[in-house]
Amino acid sequence: EIPEQPNVEDKHLAVEQDNRNLINESFRVLRTNVDFILGNDSKKVVMVTSMNQGSGKSFISANLASCVALRDKKVVVLDLDLRRATLSKIADSPKLGLADYFNGKVKNWKEIVTRSEDNENLDVLPVGTMPPNPTELLLNKTYLPDMIAELRNEYDYIFIDCPPVDIVADAGIVSKYADMTLFVIRAGLMEKSLLH
C-alpha cells in the first residue's frame, strides 16, 4: 500500500535516495515485492495500469522505477498512455517521443530517451506529439515489439505506464510484451466487490 502524497507536484518524483519517510519506505516494500514476483534476471518488463483514471498509476510507475534505479540498476520508464502523457511531465514533456517513433518521424528510439533530472540511472521515453490514433500506433507489428526487445538488452528494468484497462484497448495490446502487470487501485475510487 502506497500512502497518498498530496503535496507532490506532477512532474517531480517523491522517492529520494536517503529519505526514510513513509512514502519512500512504501516504495521500497513494493520494489522488493516486484523483485520477488519477477524472480530471475530474464524477466524485467513491468506494465503498470489501473481500472480507472485518477488511480495514481503514473505516479506509481515513475516512483517505483526511480526506487529500482536507486539500487544502481539501469531503468527506463515508457509513457505509453498516449492519450494523457502524464508520466512525460517528469521529462518536461519533450516535443518528440514514442508517438513520433511509432509513426516513423523518429527513426531510432534512442533519439527520444530523456534522462531524469532526479535520478541518473532512470531514463524516460515520453509520449512526444499527442497522436490522433494511439491504438493504431500500438498495433504496428514492428515498432513496439522490436523496441521492447532492444530495451531488454539495454536496461535492467523496463516499466511501462499504460492507460486504464477498462477505458481503451491499449493496455491489452501492450500486455503481451510484459513479464508482469501491476494493477494500481486507489482507495475510495473503486468498489471492493469489483476486485474479485
What is each of the regions a protein language model found here?
Residues 1-15:
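Short, glycine-rich, amphipathic interfacial segments at transmembrane boundaries or analogous
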Residues 4-6, 19-196:
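P-loop NTP-binding module
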